[in-house]
Amino acid sequence: MSDYQETLYEGYGQRFRMEKMLHEVRTEHQHLVIFQNPRMGRVMALDGVIQTTEADEFIYHEMLTHVPILAHGAAKRVLIIGGGDGGMLREVAKHLTVEHITMVEIDATVVEMCKEFLPNHSSGAFDDSRLNLVIDDGMRFVATTEEKFDVIISDSTDPIGPGEVLFSENFYQACHRCLNEGGILVTQNGTPFMQLSGVQTTAGRMNGLFADWHFYQAAIPTYIGGAMTFAWGATDKSYRKLPLETLRQRFSGSGIVTRYYNPEVHIGAFALPQYVLHAVNKASND
């Protein structure tokens, strides 16, 4: 029995006990490892960085999915960038009012390995008839597609390796171009305590592009460093200020059962701490 040492940060990190190595492969794009941990269940890492675990993935996937879709209220077409483990797809597919889901993943091996070794993440969602799975670079897709979407979810790795381009100015501009009127973009943005410069960079990308931009957060044990931020860009300022009762009605009407998300958490997630507000040059959470 050995340990897996994450290598994301210099001088600070986390270690996972590997009860059993389930799969290890160097794909065309990255080094993929899936192993069994006694506390977190099955764990996937890419290029030395923990990506997802069976124990707490529900927090991340529910918050990146249900917040924008329920805020929008009438999303028919959803685009997922990344998300090869299938967890984001599983949560989007729970919204029966969504008519079309396009998922763009750069690494086909990640999809196939997660189907085999992390089947609970996708829970059969890869067989959903609404899905169009595209194996391609996410940046290239949003830069060239003629399709439009109501919600775009960027479920990227950290801004290193294949995921680096998904934090570029060109990526945010291309996503904005792909949104229908009234569309929403959300992206994974790391833990601000450890990756504050990344949050600042994203704020600079969003400001000027979107009528309303902000961040929201959730605490996910696997992603060390405190609460994780998700970037929010909307073409309609009202989405972030929806009354609690409206969200309750939409959530109840969806019939979706969650383990983390609820309308109260939805609203509270947009309340950022002072150091993050200061970093992104916002005077308040308004």
From Swiss-Prot:
Its main localization is cytoplasm
Q: Which Pfam families match?
A: Spermine_synt_N, Spermine_synth
Q: What is the superkingdom listed in this entry's lineage?
A: Bacteria
Q: Which residues form a coiled coil?
A: none
Q: Residue ranges of the PABS domain?
A: 1-235
A GO biological process this protein is involved in? Answer: spermidine biosynthetic process
Q: Which residues bind S-methyl-5'-thioadenosine?
A: 30, 105, 137-138, 162
Which keywords does this chain's UniProt record carry? Answer: Cytoplasm, Polyamine biosynthesis, Spermidine biosynthesis, Transferase
In this protein, the active site sits at: 155 (proton acceptor)
In which pathway does this enzyme or protein participate?
Amine and polyamine biosynthesis; spermidine biosynthesis; spermidine from putrescine: step 1/1
Q: Identify the EC number(s).
A: 2.5.1.16
PROSITE patterns for this protein: PABS_1, PABS_2
Q: Which GO terms describe its molecular function?
A: spermidine synthase activity
Q: Where does spermidine bind?
A: 61, 85, 155-158
Q: Which GO terms describe its cellular component?
A: cytosol
Q: What does this protein do?
A: Catalyzes the irreversible transfer of a propylamine group from the amino donor S-adenosylmethioninamine (decarboxy-AdoMet) to putrescine (1,4-diaminobutane) to yield spermidine.
Q: How does it assemble?
A: Homodimer or homotetramer.
Q: Which family does it belong to?
A: Belongs to the spermidine/spermine synthase family.
Q: What is this protein called?
A: Polyamine aminopropyltransferase
Q: Which organism is it from?
A: Pseudomonas syringae pv. tomato (strain ATCC BAA-871 / DC3000)
Lineage, top ranks: Bacteria, Pseudomonadati, Pseudomonadota, Gammaproteobacteria, Pseudomonadales
